[in-house]
Amino acid sequence: MTREELYQSIYTHETIYIPPQEEGSAALEVALGCSWHKCTFCDFARDEFFIHPLSRIEHNLQILGMLQPENTRLFLLGENAFCLSTEFLCQIIDLVAKYMPNVHRIAMYSRADDILRKTDEELRLLKSRGVAALHIGVESGSDPILAERCKGVTSAQILDALHRLEQTGIDYFVTIIPGLGGREYSHLHALETARLLNQLHPKNIWCLKLKLWEDTKLCKEAQKGFFQMMTPEEILLEERLMLENLHVKDCLFEDTTVLDQYTIYGMLPDQKKDLLRAIDYLLARP
Ligand code: SF4
């Protein structure tokens, strides 16, 4: 088999997605889809939720170890791979040590409630076994918006989960969805999200503006007039309000979807003024 064929043999889909912060990591598919699968805006979790048996994971790891023997970083694929039991994650990590002994940093996607279902002891164990970072879709700090979009967690639960990661020393990266509240809740979304983030210490805040994906519930609500989608300019103005009210420290802020064509990024708090200036400049264009 060629290298390409070997890679193809270990992934279900042709394209795999890992967060930009994990670029360069080897990617091991441990699950497909999302165990929650109910957020009304989500087009990400297309597969039915499925956890690969350990035998399949071991087989894939053997191949991945052959293809990337020197890689020190591993990303576990699955829309919320951290929902796997601690015991199962530890079994996977045992196999990682066998087939990819150079790996010392493991990251994956997680929901806030996946973290809450684990005890402090389990979180500490996973950290000691190499789980160094989780990527979490926070989306909004506003409870009415989280509830309306069926996120399945409250802002208090998000806060609790991420504080527990901080106590354990597991890093976390969060995504926010500007525009998720629609025109009606735009201010609330901006201010409540800033309020939530100000109580946290994420490594990175990644804004991905709302996109209405065909066939999602939210898209259908918008078509029926129950959700007012904002223009890209309105969404950027909302993001500006959130940024203005953000007081997080040592955190990279980025948005790769500005006006559907630009990327802005900068460290907070030092580059906050530059980021606001960049937004003002883009909003002032004809
Ligand atoms: S938790 Fe994430 S992956 Fe799962 S349905 Fe919601 S947005 Fe999609």
Which residues are covered by each model-predicted region?
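Auxiliary Fe-S-binding modules of radical SAM enzymes
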Residues: 1-22, 198-286
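Catalytic cores of alpha/beta
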Residues: 121-122, 181-199
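Hydrophobic faces of well-ordered beta-strands that scaffold small-molecule active sites
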Residues: 26-28, 72-74, 104-108, 134-136, ...
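Conserved SAM/AdoMet-binding glycine-rich loop
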Residues: 66-167, 247
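Aromatic/hydrophobic pocket-lining residues that form the small-molecule binding cavity
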Residues: 57, 89, 119, 158, ...
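Conserved strand-turn element in the central/C-terminal portion of the radical SAM core barrel
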Residues: 113, 137, 141-145, 165-189, ...
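Conserved, mostly hydrophobic/aromatic
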Residues: 34, 42, 57, 76, ...
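Canonical Radical SAM [4Fe-4S] cluster-binding loop centered on the CxxxCxxC motif
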Residues: 13-56
